[in-house]
Amino acid sequence: MNLLIDRMENPGSRNCTLLPPSFPRGFCKGRRASSGDAVKIKESGLQPQPQPEPLQAKTNVAHFSKSSSRLPVIAVNDNPVVPRPSTEVNLGSLLQKEREKEKEEQPALHDRRHLYVTKNRAHGVRQRSLEMTSLPVLGSTKTGKFSDFLFEDDIDNRVGRHSRSYSGASSLDDPFRVSPKTDFNSNRARLSCLSKGRRGSMSVFQSCHTGLAFNQIQGSSSSQRRSSAGSFDYERKRLVNQFLQPSLGNSDPFDTLRESVVFEPSSTAGGIKLGNMHSQSQISVNSSPSTSLFYHDLDGSAVNDSSSFLYSRSNVPAFLSSSAFSSTSSTSSDSEDVDRRSLNGVYPSLGYLTNQRKPRNSSGSSTAPGTDTLGFKYLLNRQKSADSSTRFKSVLKVNNNNGSAATPDSSSNSISKSNSNLNDNIDELNYYQNHISTLLVKIENEMRRNLNDTIIKNENNVQKTIQKYDLLSGELTLLLDEMTTLRTTVINQFLVKLKSDFDEDDNKAFINELKISVEESVAQLQGLERRMEVCQERLNKQKSSLREMDSLIELKNVLNKSKNNTKSIYLYRYFIIDIIAFLLMGGFIVYVKNLLTRFFTR
């Protein structure tokens, strides 16, 4: 999630540490340079390319040494598996095969015209060898976001910027704009790579396609890239915005082009020309990496299916500039009439496209057409013939019949063949645009329905809440008024009286009266304490007297008890005396008897 947020906040930069090891180090440098950093990219010159074999060996060793320090080594039978090297090696092998094929197909030429063509071909081969050594900037961050264009109309905002970006040959609408000279040679290699990508594998097409797109960076200075970074951000968003717009009517931008139309940037005129081989072999239109990436991503299904989305005319975005289909100056009035009749008869949507793009070219600038025609060039060259000698002979025959001094063009027949095949997929015209627009309408209706249901359900609650809020606001206002009145009363009345009561200078003040009463109470308390001391002494005396009285009472009780006891004995004293007397008398009688008995017995 952090990576996604960082990518949305910084769409022009990429963390190179997260890229797979198969990407070379120059990939990240190109990204930083396109974002306006101080990293400078060397401009490509007309220097020979090193041999592919040493480059491949060097790339393998460097790639293995770099990746082995970060990744675990995978071995099969104790032999390390070296990862697939950079696509630069594949491009080198592709270039070598192309050189060998051109040498085999090149006929024996002797005159000046043939030598000129041979020289141009060799120059194109050298230029392609320089252009295929770098990888382009590829990433979803260069295509903008769908949410930036769905609910806003930026036609008025685009007019000023577009007119400024195309106002001169030196002004760049994005960091990847290159000069006409550089674009002339780069487009030659691009056409060849696209044709080989259809015959070869998908990886070969990706390598060639990406290498050509990134080479455009090397044709511009770092200061120009920094000054036009904002325009490039606009350009990438404009691509997605115009692709998602539903088509109006039956207009198709590619219906306005025909076989004899060649776009050539010039400082004096930006119209439709019939040029020599040097100009006809290229469609000199600057294309941004956003467009390249857009069609490159859509090419996955187009390689195996000729009726796929990429090859159908419904895929064509409606953003080609009208300057590519108009001419301000011409070398021949006959050619202009032929072009006009062909455009009006075969491609009826030219007027619509011109009216749609008229505000963008109101400044009267005579620059190259729009920068998003790489998809058109790819469609025109998707069925390029492999037999170059046949193309050469057919073009040479046409030039000889017309008596013109123009050199033969190796791509004119391919344009006518590809134009004839554009009608194969007419059933799919505007299918995807209509499908996307229909889905957007359905989504919008669903959103509106849900919004209305929610509003109807919650409207009563909102009204009740507002009423409660109004009542609470009124109560709070009344409470605030009461608090203000109370504060005024306290300040003006109670605080004044309180201050007067505690004024020490006033003898009649409450504080002074309180002091006097407290002093009097203290004096009374002191007198009470003295009286309490006297009472305590008296109490001690009374306690001693009470103790004596208690002892006397106890003695008296004992005497009373003894008296009571003596009284009971006194009552029975005569009885006791009688008993004692009887006992004595009985004893005396017994004694007397004994005596008498003894006496008589003697």
Curated annotation (Swiss-Prot):
Polar residues composition bias: residue spans: 352-369, 399-408
Region feature Disordered, mapped onto this chain: 31-55, 83-108, 323-369, 399-419
Subcellular locations according to the entry = Endoplasmic reticulum membrane
Q: What is its main location?
A: endoplasmic reticulum
Q: Where is the composition biased (Basic and acidic residues)?
A: 96-108
- Name the residue ranges with Low complexity bias: 323-333, 409-419
Output the InterPro entries linked to this UniProt entry.
HPH_family
Query: By its UniProt entry, which Pfam families does this protein fall under?
Result: Hph (PF13694)
The residues that cross the membrane are: 575-595
| PTM section of the record | Phosphorylated. Is dephosphorylated by calcineurin.
* Phosphoserine modified-residue sites: S167, S342
- Alphabetized UniProt keyword annotations: Endoplasmic reticulum, Membrane, Phosphoprotein, Transmembrane, Transmembrane helix
| Taxonomic superkingdom | Eukaryota
Protein's GO biological process: cellular response to alkaline pH; cellular response to salt stress; post-translational protein targeting to membrane, translocation
Gene Ontology terms: cellular component: endoplasmic reticulum; endoplasmic reticulum membrane
Kindly give the membrane topology term recorded for this protein: Single-pass membrane protein
- Subunit: Interacts with the 2 calcineurin A subunits CNA1 and CMP2, and with HPH2/FRT2.
Protein purpose: Calcineurin-dependent protein required for growth under high NaCl, alkaline pH and cell wall stress.
Any other noteworthy remark? Present with 251 molecules/cell in log phase SD medium.
Instruction: Specify the protein name.
Output: Protein HPH1
What is this protein's gene name? Answer: FRT1
